[in-house]
C-alpha cells in the first residue's frame, strides 16, 4: 500500500472511532504503522480507556500466571472491546496469544485442564454469563502470524493492547 493510501485509511479509521466515542491516538498510529504516519494524520489525542476496560486489563494482569506455561508463551494481548477501550461491565476479556512453534495444541490442552478447576475461561456454551471471563480469541504459533485481510482482523490488530512481552508487538 502506498503512503497516501495508508494515511487515508488511518484518517477514515480515526473518524469512525471518534463517532463511536473512542478516538485513535498518535501513539497507536506510531506503534502500528510507524512514526512517519502519526505526523501525517490530523489527530485528536484522546485515546483513554474507560474505567471498565482498565479494570479488566488489571484483572488479566493479576491472572497472567494462569496463561504462562513452561516459558513457551511469547505474547499475550487484549483485543476486542477491552483493547479498543470501550468495554462494558458485562463484557468478557478477549485474548490474543502467541506461543512457540509446535506448542499450540499442548498449550490449548493446558488451558482446558486449568479451566476445569478455575472456570475463568469462556466456553462456547457460556452465552449469558461472560462477565470478566477470558475469551481466547486466537492462539497462534510464531510461524503462523499471518492473517486474512478483512475488517475483523484489522480491528483486532488495530486495538490490540500488549499485556505480556510488549516488545513482541513488532512481530505481529
Residue ranges: model-predicted function:
Residues 2-90, 99-172:
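Catalytic core of pol beta-like nucleotidyltransferases
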